[in-house]
């Protein structure tokens, strides 16, 4: 089944500063949606609005036309990978996979070193290895939509390439929205692109527009 996620009618301010205003962004099954924007332009805030982490009545978030009125999200609808590590440090690696109901053997087929770390606690892993676990769990979850905030941070180029291939496979079953400062990776993997600028969103129909905005040379 194809699904459609939309957000618009956003008004987000912190004090007297407007963060987001004229916004419309959509994600759908079968597509990866990349979002560009300078530091402080509201990319993370936008993902948090979609995920319900920033409470404001001045927004409309819809899945298949049905408004999501509560601030909490059904994990079957949406999962989010934040910029910071989010898994509890005291749990074992295998326990995280059991909680998300994700195949650990499949994970190890991509990242073989984890076969020796099955019962290691998360706090014993490096930040990069934790990121690998968390990103895989979100992408392989049963959610209709995955929101990824800086998914390539702390990853080696090899692991970035692995996750780009995983995203290409997973998008057949879900919609994926991602932001990242590694702009070339975002343009290479995305089907749709948006730029956040001056509190508004702009859909990029021509890749050369990204040169005008200063994201590509």
Give the location of each predicted region.
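The feature captures the beta-strand-to-loop junction immediately N-terminal to the Walker
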Residues: 36-38
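ABC ATPase NBD coupling module
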Residues: 54-55, 66-79
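Helix-to-loop junction immediately C-terminal to a conserved catalytic motif
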Residues: 51
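Conserved structural motif at the start of ABC-family nucleotide-binding domains
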Residues: 5, 19-22
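Conserved beta-strand-loop-alpha-helix hinge in the C-terminal portion
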Residues: 200-217
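Q-loop/switch helix immediately C-terminal to the Walker
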Residues: 80-105
